[in-house]
C-alpha cells in the first residue's frame, strides 16, 4: 500500500513537471514569434470599426509644423502648405524606446491613440480632435535636424534638412467624423519616417 502511494505521488509530480515545462516552452516560442513580427500587425484599432479604405496603412507623406503643430496627410506622397500646417493641431514629443523589441516589454496601450488622446480631452461635448501626430523623440533630437545637410524637398523654398535616421511616430486619426468628447475613438498608425525641415522659421516639417 505504501509503495503504491509513493509511486502514485511520484507519477503526479512528473506529470506536473511535464506540464510546467510544456507551458514555459510554449510561452517562449510565442514571444519569439512576436519579436519577429511588426508591432502594427497586432494592433486591433487599425482594422476594426472603420469605413471602406480606412485603417489601411500606406506610404503617405506627412507635413508637420515644428512649433508644436501637426497635421497628418493620408493620401500617398501628399504635402501640406504652410497655411494648412498652421491651422492644424498640436504635436507632442515623447521619449523613444531603445528598440522595437522594447515595445513588447510594455503594455500595448502605451502606443494606443485612444489612451494617449484621452489626456487631451479637457471638456465634454466638444468636437473631437480630427487628427494628431505623436513624435516619440527627444525634442533636442528633432531640433538637431537643422544642423544637417540641405537636400531637395517639396516644401516651400525647395530646400530642407533631413533627419539622420527615421523618427518614431504614432499617427492618430478619428475613426468616424462628428464625434464629441469624451466619446472619441481613434485609429492607431505606428511607423518610422525620415523628417525633412525647412528650418527657416521652424514651422514646416515633412516626413517620408
From Swiss-Prot:
Instruction: Mention one GO biological process in which this protein takes part, according to its record.
Output: heterotypic cell-cell adhesion
The residues that carry sugar chains are 125, 147
Q: Which InterPro entries match?
A: RNaseA, RNaseA-like_dom_sf, RNaseA_domain
Q: Tell me the leader sequence span.
A: 1-24
Spell out the subcellular localization from the entry. Secreted
Choose one Gene Ontology CC annotation of this protein and give it: extracellular region
Q: Which domain of life is it from?
A: Eukaryota
Q: State the Gene Ontology terms under molecular function.
A: nucleic acid binding
Disulfide bridge map: none
The UniProt entry lists the main location of this chain as secreted
Keywords in UniProt for this one?
Answer: Cell adhesion, Fertilization, Glycoprotein, Secreted, Signal
Effect of disrupting the coding gene: Mice are viable, anatomically normal and reach adulthood but display impaired fertility consequent to an inability of the spermatozoa to ascend the uterotubal junction (UTJ) canal of the female reproductive tract and gain the site of fertilization. Spermatozoa fail to establish a strong association with either epididymal epithelial cells, the zona pellucida of oocytes or oviductal epithelial cells, yet they are capable of fertilizing eggs in vitro.
| PTM | The N-terminus is blocked. Glycosylated.
- Asked whether the UniProt record includes Signal among its keywords, one would answer yes
Which body tissues produce this protein? Answer: Male-specific expression in proximal caput of the epididymis (at protein level).
Q: Which Pfam families match?
A: RnaseA
Summarizing the function annotation, the protein's role is:
Secreted proximal epididymal protein required for post-testicular sperm maturation and male fertility. May be involved in sperm adhesion to the egg zona pellucida. Does not have ribonuclease activity.
Tell me its family.
Answer: Belongs to the pancreatic ribonuclease family.
Any idea what this protein is called?
Inactive ribonuclease-like protein 10
Amino acid at each position: 500500500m505504501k509503495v503504491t502511494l509513493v509511486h502514485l505521488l511520484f507519477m503526479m509530480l512528473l506529470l506536473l513537471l511535464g506540464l510546467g515545462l510544456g507551458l514555459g516552452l510554449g510561452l517562449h516560442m510565442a514571444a519569439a514569434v512576436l519579436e519577429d513580427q511588426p508591432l502594427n500587425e497586432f494592433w486591433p484599432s487599425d482594422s476594426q470599426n472603420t469605413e471602406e479604405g480606412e485603417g489601411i496603412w500606406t506610404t503617405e507623406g506627412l507635413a508637420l509644423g515644428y512649433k508644436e503643430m501637426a497635421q497628418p496627410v493620408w493620401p500617398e506622397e501628399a504635402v501640406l502648405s504652410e497655411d494648412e500646417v498652421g491651422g492644424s493641431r498640436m504635436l507632442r514629443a515623447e521619449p523613444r524606446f531603445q528598440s522595437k523589441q522594447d515595445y513588447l516589454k510594455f503594455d500595448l496601450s502605451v502606443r494606443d491613440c485612444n489612451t494617449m488622446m484621452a489626456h487631451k480631452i479637457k471638456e465634454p461635448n466638444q468636437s473631437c480632435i480630427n487628427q494628431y501626430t505623436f513624435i516619440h523623440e527627444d525634442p533636442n533630437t528633432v531640433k538637431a535636424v537643422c544642423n544637417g545637410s540641405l537636400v531637395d524637398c517639396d516644401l516651400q523654398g525647395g530646400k530642407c534638412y533631413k533627419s539622420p535616421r527615421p523618427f518614431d511616430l504614432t499617427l492618430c486619426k478619428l475613426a468616424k467624423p462628428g464625434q464629441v468628447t469624451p466619446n472619441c475613438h481613434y485609429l492607431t498608425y505606428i511607423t518610422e519616417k525620415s523628417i525633412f525641415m525647412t528650418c527657416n522659421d521652424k514651422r514646416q516639417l515633412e516626413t517620408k
